[in-house]
């Protein structure tokens, strides 16, 4: 069987429309609710994805579609990691056999998540391909170094999944949708184990190779920063997706690691605000109200 499958060769039928990060963030239907016109001191000023938003339906459906395509790629990525590398002690492009088994178990979890997500999307009135598929998750699973895959996929992107599932679980609760709430809670429990597994293996395999560990954690920060674009996720009410600190701690993140992610989210939000300010200034528009 072929090894090291490139992202350009992913098997997709005509229903799927693939996109890049820039195009995705420009999609007006993405889960980035507008701020309420109420006072910034009121609860209505939050940018969190809640059912009372006028664009809540499209935002939630778009986010659910993104979860579904992400689960497909997570399944493909876990399967590739189990197959691409020979069994060994973790050096010279090998991975411990026990890690192969863990990745195979994760692939089974992801297959179940795909089935759940497809049914949830149908439940929410979304057709496959209605929203574009961003293939960055599988791109992170294409590294020649299995430890970079653990850092980029299991810690960074599966970590983001913890934040997203927590937000969607809360959305289902507020919307009075027990199906959405239960399914998101079920998948969230799996994601915590996936991130914890990735964290544990990264530390074990790089225990005697601090340079390799530092490189992996640097790659993780690059991926985290990419998905912090525009402050989509963060601790403040200006971010639609909250940083799920408690679940990240359960998944093996240290307090310092969570703070680093939070700081990157704040920087990304500030960068987006500055981009908006410059764009409005160039267009001759008044600055946005504070």
Language model: regions and residue ranges:
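Non-heme di-metal
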Residues: 1-290
């Amino acid at each position: 069987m072929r090894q090291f499958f490139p992202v350009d060769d992913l098997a997709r039928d005509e229903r799927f429309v693939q996109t890049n990060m820039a195009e995705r963030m420009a999609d007006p239907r993405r889960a980035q609710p507008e701020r309420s016109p109420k006072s910034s001191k009121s609860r209505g000023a939050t940018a969190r994805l809640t059912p009372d938003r006028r664009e809540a339906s499209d935002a939630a459906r778009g986010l659910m579609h993104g979860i579904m395509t992400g689960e497909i790629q997570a399944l493909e990525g876990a399967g590739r990691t189990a197959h691409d590398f020979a069994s060994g002690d973790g050096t010279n492009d090998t991975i411990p056999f026990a890690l192969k088994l863990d990745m195979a178990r994760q692939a089974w979890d992801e297959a179940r998540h795909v089935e759940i997500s497809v049914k949830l999307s149908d439940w929410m009135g979304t057709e496959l391909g209605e929203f574009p598929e961003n293939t960055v998750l599988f791109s992170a699973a294409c590294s020649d170094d299995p430890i970079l895959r653990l850092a980029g996929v299991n810690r960074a992107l599966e970590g983001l999944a913890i934040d997203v599932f927590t937000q969607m679980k809360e959305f289902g609760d507020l919307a009075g949708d027990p199906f959405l709430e239960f399914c998101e809670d079920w998948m969230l429990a799996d994601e915590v184990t996936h991130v914890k597994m990735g964290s544990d293996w990264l530390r074990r395999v790089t225990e005697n190779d601090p340079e390799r560990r530092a490189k992996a954690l640097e790659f993780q920060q690059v991926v985290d920063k990419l998905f912090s674009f525009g402050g989509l996720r963060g601790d403040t009410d200006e971010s639609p997706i909250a940083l799920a600190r408690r679940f990240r701690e359960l998944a093996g993140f240290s307090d310092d690691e969570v703070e680093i992610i939070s700081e990157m989210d704040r920087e990304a939000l500030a960068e987006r605000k500055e981009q908006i300010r410059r764009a409005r200034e160039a267009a001759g528009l008044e600055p946005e109200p504070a």
